Amino acid sequence: MDVAGKKVAVLGARRSGMAVAELLSLKGASVFVSELGTIGAHESARLQALRIPFEEGGHSDNVLCTDFCVISPGIPGRAPVVRAMLEKGIPLFSEIEVAYWFCKARIIGITGTDGKTTTATLVHRIFETDGMTHRYRAFSVGNIGQPFSSRVLTMRPEDVAVIELSSYQLEGCCTFRPDVSVITNITPDHLDRYEGELHNYAQTKYRIYAHQGKEDTLVYNDDDPLLHDHFASNRETLPCRIVPFGIGCKPEHAGFAAAVRFCDHRIVFDAGAKSENIIEAEDFLKRSFRGRHNIANALAAVAAARALGIGNEAIRSALQGFSGVEHRQEFVRTLDGSDWINDSKATNINALSQALETVPGRMVLIAGGRDKGSDYREIAGIVRKKVAALVAIGEAREKLCAAYGGMVDVRSANSLEEAVSLARALVEPGQTVLFSPGCSSFDMFEDFEDRGRQFKKLTTDLRS
């Protein structure tokens, strides 16, 4: 799209907002940045250097004098400024959509409730490995790494952009068309933003493939009940090539052009009547990368790589060297016979349940944060089976105590530091301390990364 001379309002002056404001300015647009909170000193200086006018502490009517608006993913559709723009008929786009207008590289878009970051990181490693041989670059952008807008102008046609996409980012995508789209799974999350309806949340996720054509590929998790049913009834209407992945030997995959599965302790790529063994389980599963969910992440990455013609050697090399992602069931230390695990990225109960299933043995669980409207009783079975004691923190601690009180030993802590101290006192040799909040972090921390770093520091500071 030609944006030269267009008036553009950018709502939000954090990383993606700053990046898209600079991109649009470089492309000749007249940009105005509006921030509800305070703009940092570095960001203010950068905007002034670029001669981009801005405001902070609220959104004035200036944002309504615009040809279109780029909206931060953190701003919900019910926000007054968004409603005012919609009433005036102002088009709203996400930073991802705008960056896509200027992208020359091949694109792999990855979304889902859980597993996005691990899958995106693994896909990036595969293409990074292959790129060293075939002389192209792989970029990791979007919800992971740097904003898409900050790197898009350096991307060449032979390069690959691996983009992790949240539902919030997909809301503002209208023409975005990845060469390969990946959906890792869909379970209830962020329902407070989607009127409490899983259907609304899922429909937003499906936007990732909405504009794909016959030359493109859609990869999805066929073990996910919602995705299985959705594509069983819709795949004949989609023009793109569809590649399911799943655990087990599945005869129903014979109807697809290709499929990736985990069968007989190895990853197998099926293409028609031909099957290829990609890698043995023992060559990629390890202490820092284990569990059914990580097998699924590896299957998704293999499917995405094969969709763009990557050979098995590069795939195997990347998988063998992959040791997981920070804050995802990350081993921190062993103290007095007990392992301490940081799973701060578990921001919903599905991720919490996966951690409980994956980490072996009994454990002391530290959980809680800002509740997303979850029903914690849904995972009562695995909690009863695996959790010896629960230390609840954050805004959700009373709800957690009510859900699991009488089922396990439940304690309440006013801070993460207190929770770590309680866990230290409760854990027995041979058990694990698992920090897997099952909630968002914004009640007590900047984000899940800040939360995870604080847990790791508190844990490493403990003395034997």
UniProtKB/Swiss-Prot annotation:
PANTHER family documented for this protein: UDP-N-ACETYLMURAMOYLALANINE--D-GLUTAMATE LIGASE
This protein's record includes keyword ATP-binding: yes
Binding site for ATP: 112-118
Reaction equation(s) it catalyzes: UDP-N-acetyl-alpha-D-muramoyl-L-alanine + D-glutamate + ATP = UDP-N-acetyl-alpha-D-muramoyl-L-alanyl-D-glutamate + ADP + phosphate + H(+)
Localization: Cytoplasm
Keyword Chloroplast: no
Pfam families (UniProt xref): Mur_ligase_C (PF02875), Mur_ligase_M (PF08245), MurD_N (PF21377)
Record's protein name: UDP-N-acetylmuramoylalanine--D-glutamate ligase
EC number(s) given by UniProt: 6.3.2.9
Coiled coil segments of this chain: none
Pathway: Cell wall biogenesis; peptidoglycan biosynthesis
InterPro entries assigned to the protein according to its UniProt record, in alphabetical order: Mur-like_cat_sf (IPR036565), Mur_ligase_C (IPR004101), Mur_ligase_C_dom_sf (IPR036615), Mur_ligase_cen (IPR013221), MurD (IPR005762)
Function: Cell wall formation. Catalyzes the addition of glutamate to the nucleotide precursor UDP-N-acetylmuramoyl-L-alanine (UMA).
GO cellular-component term (any): cytoplasm
GO biological process: cell division; cell wall organization; peptidoglycan biosynthetic process; regulation of cell shape
Record's keyword terms, sorted: ATP-binding, Cell cycle, Cell division, Cell shape, Cell wall biogenesis/degradation, Cytoplasm, Ligase, Nucleotide-binding, Peptidoglycan synthesis
Main location group: cytoplasm
Naturally occurring in which organism (per UniProt): Chlorobium phaeobacteroides (strain DSM 266 / SMG 266 / 2430)
UniProt family annotation: Belongs to the MurCDEF family.
Lineage: Bacteria, Pseudomonadati, Chlorobiota, Chlorobiia, Chlorobiales
MF (Gene Ontology): ATP binding; UDP-N-acetylmuramoylalanine-D-glutamate ligase activity
